[in-house]
Amino acid sequence: MKKKVIAYLHTHWDRERYREFESFRLRLIKVLDNVLNLLESGKIPSFYFDGQTSALQDYLEINPEKEALVRKLIKQKKLFIGPCYTLVDEFLTDGICFRKNLEIGLKYAKSMGCEDFLGYFADTFGHSKNVPLILKEFGIDKAVVWRGCPDIIPSEFLFNGIKTVNLIQGYFLDIFSADKSIEEKAEFLESHLDKIAQKSKDVLLLPIGADHLGVEPDIAEQIKAVNKLLKHYEIELSSPFKYFELVKNNFQFEYNQELRDNATTFILPGCYSTRTQLKKSNAKCSYLLDLANKFQKFGQKKYKTDSFDNVIEYAYKLLLQNQAHDGICGCSIDAVHRENNIRYEKVLQIATTLIKEILVETGENSMIINLSNQEFTGIIKFDSPVKYSEKEFEVISETRGVADAITYDSQKIPITEDYKPIYTYLAEIDHKTPSKLLSRTTKPYGGSYTQSDLEFTNTRIENSNICLSIKNGEIKLTDKITGNVYPNFIEFVNFKDLGDTYNFGPDKSDTGKQGEIISSEILRVGGLQSALLVKFKIGTIILDAEIALNKNSHLLKFKIIWNNKMRNHLLQVKFNLKEPITKTFSEDMNTLITREFDPNYEIRKNLPKEKGLEVKTNTAPMQRYVATQGFEVVTKGLCEYEVSQNTLLITLLRSIGVVSNPKNPARTTPAGPPILVDEAQQIGLNIAEFAIGFSSEENWQTAINEIYPQIIYNF
């Protein structure tokens, strides 16, 4: 008896990748016109539109006259859309944005009449263990995955409580579009289905479709012909939802960890460090847009300010368009990422303008609002046209401009006389607790050096919690709370990169070049913040490291500035701990997850030789935070860390120049086209920012709030 195969027609639609968005949209119009015609004529029973809504919205923006037909087909359960707005990367998108992705996607899908949803992540580069939990929040109890599944996982399994299907052979199947005889197609499918059957029971799931691919007009006839030739299988065109119904009792195997195994599928982990500028912009936009959203809700409740919900949704759509995996992962052509940068600029414009306009609307001249659910103690930086005395605030710079109270008041127009001094201050906030209504509180108090715990020389900076000192070309860190001393703790190292946008490609013989300290001096002196400027040299690279420390803080803040003139290289900062690193704690979807590592694993000794393999790495994604052995790092858009023996490394820059290098030593099969992308080399000015300190990972949110303060203020 033949096994039943439920096949569903689909297309995987990257809005932009090896072609620009508008170029792909023109292709989308052709593909979807064809699909709608086939659905309306009854030549195909249904079409699953990639688990997202943005592509359909892109189509209807050009062809609004097709909306009635689309609605009809959705109501007839022939066309399935959503639940997501875009197919974002799960490790480079935070939990707030991921929820917004579902919120916006479901809102639109339901407005179009769609009622059936599953978390469809067929091409995502691995899967966060937190995604099933978020799906549950939105009433979704099914998911489809592929990349990152270890070999032990069968076709059907429970992924953190969600009924999940593992696409054993992936989503990409274009055999029905190939120039082959029906006999050749049947032979291929027999072998293909045999592999799926090894991990399935009586019913198999077969995706039919591929990236940006339309449906063959005679697909039903082809399947009918193929069925006559298949020995062990009978293919039925239907939908993923019918498959889930047929196998509803098969979900016995449980797996509750993240899906990042690359033994059988590529997870392309080099994407976490490709085009770091995109990641930095993404982190900044995600932070500020969330802050603006919280503040506009607060303003509506407390001050009856205008609602900006529609503006916030528009900004999140722009941000989510950039978080689609071929966007945020940096593995598209240069023109695509230039457009990404424009969208990021738009999001920043919206977020900053909203915050400042709402501040003007409140009518408050002096206010501090803590929008987090945690008490805040720390230093904030703010601009003001008011010349405060040094007893109130610590001034750190002066420029000229127009006050926000004029710029963001729609009843005022700036004139030449409004162009006046603008001062940048540091202010200390002490034990600012969020009230139930997040209400207005008093002005913070300033500090003076005589009241400060900061101490410094040209080669040392410290407070009551932490000390950094430089001697004999090495940086020593001291945790003054525990008394632990870490000699030669911070180093910079540079490696060759023979890879591409998808994977770092190590040179077998490359041991890396270590940076050397060439100078150290006091950069800034103050009672609230002091800073050193330390210069490093690595070959031809000169790094300027601004190292700042705030009064009473546990965190040293680093701002690394350099002019990158090198190509095809990997630049990292190393932190040399006392013990081999076997476990890390890192941020994932705004929660902390634990990962285990083999500290002795060496990538250069394990490069693949057989076709179709991707090297295992000791790198992992992070969103803003990683910790181990009581040491913590908070970054501003640096999303990749690595473990090597007793060393934790953070990637500052990965310069590469090709989308997919067919000679990449880390991967024996191409992952995309070999298109040259010179802008991925990131030649020119680069800035990397992170903070380090000693604390238990249980206090990770406190560290996050110091670097990403949930504070709105106006002086």
Model-found features: residue ranges?
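Short, solvent-exposed turn/loop segments enriched in Gly/Ser/Thr/Pro and often Arg
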Residues: 48-57, 84-87, 119-128, 146-151, ...
